From Swiss-Prot:
Keywords per UniProt: ATP-binding, Cell cycle, Cell division, Cell shape, Cell wall biogenesis/degradation, Cytoplasm, Ligase, Nucleotide-binding, Peptidoglycan synthesis
Name used for this protein in its record: UDP-N-acetylmuramate--L-alanine ligase
Pathway assigned in UniProt: Cell wall biogenesis; peptidoglycan biosynthesis
GO cellular component: cytoplasm
Name of the gene this protein is made from: murC
HAMAP family found in the cross-reference section: MurC (MF_00046)
Amino acid sequence: MRGVATDIGTIHFIGIGGIGMSGIAEVMHNLGYRVQGSDIADSYVVEGLRKRGIKVAIGHAPENVDGVAVVVTSTAVKRGNPEVEAALAQRIPIVRRAEMLAELMRLKSTVAIAGTHGKTTTTSLVAALLDAGGIDPTVINGGIINNYGSNARLGASDWMVVEADESDGSFLRLDGTIAVVTNIDPEHLDHYGSFDAIKDAFVEFIENVPFYGAAMLCLDHPEVQAIIPRIRDRRIITYGFSAQADVRGTNVTPGPDGNRFDVVVRDRDGNSRTIEGIHLPMSGRHNVQNALAAVAVALHMGVPDEKIVSGFNGFAGVKRRFTKVGEIVTDEGVVTVIDDYAHHPVEIRAVLSAAREGAGAGRVVAVVQPHRFTRLRDHMDDFQQAFNDADMVLALPVYAAGESPIEGVSSDALVRGLRDRGHRQANVVADADALAASLAASIKAGDLGAGDMIICLGAGDITKMAAGLASAVEGAA
């Protein structure tokens, strides 16, 4: 960090396997700092860090912080954690993840990408276009960028692209030179208390942009559009499908290999031009919207049109964003298994719409693992209306993520609501074995076959089930 030598001692990350923590740890390691960490379990993220030379202990123990200079924690790590308590006893400084990220951002000019949904994909797309334009940014993302094989990378330029997490309000520490807001929906109400407070936080995030920076705002989203009049003395560039957008997507044509579209760009003098023939190798209209945010950033930073087109062509996607993880071979043909991080009703609706687009005449089976009892409680009505594009819904038990159960809030309640709203095939499955057995029975009955898609949805451990689902179903047949 600027003005701080890299020999300050060892920096210890508690929960280093978390997707946000790991990115900061990796970049700091690449900058030359001594970095280590701990996590409660092995994971692909932990293995990736070890391959890069970062020591990771499994399990939290007081001795893990012996001799370290500073401890970094996320909001998920609370008092009572043995490493936190040991650090306090030894008077070792403890800093939050967002504070450390903010220190990294002081090194460079930054594109900070916020929004209730679409942050990770948009961050990845911005990085891809800046790479194509020769800018070579440092990147810290909330998901694995397939082109990098990691969620972080140290670039050679003076620019950094970061995903700004609004969940605990800490994104207000991240002062971007360029800010992007993809959308604003009622989420993380346990922290903010009200939707108005969430909107106020996004206004403050935008106002943190310096006078020489810019804010890229999605004009299609009503709540984003509604806060624009509140922004004073900051340059605003709008994007979306709206005819009023400065960067507007047109002629969107979905296909089996993603989307093709054009972009109409209008400058401040009212003149316009069109970037034609963009190919985005991702399904879903919502991903075209994310791509438009990336176009807005790239154009503002001087990336030529032809480099924008080539940047999209070379984009390899993001792990757990509509990721194909397997195929189930049936007598009729192949059923595709997709893994996706979607865990909010808006996200689920968008992913299932993309699946319906991709499946064509095929059937779409949604396997959902609700994430957190509070989220399911706060959005139960929306969840019960989010599965209209799924021919069949199989709901696993709620992934608690450390929360205590809430009476009346369960996957059974979700399924009852789906049925009450007219869904013809919605059922609860108890675990991974029951899921495999249910899908195998559907294949045997001829209800699932060639051209069909199984979409696994959730932010919990459903990703592990998705990875092994094809072999589990074939074994249960």
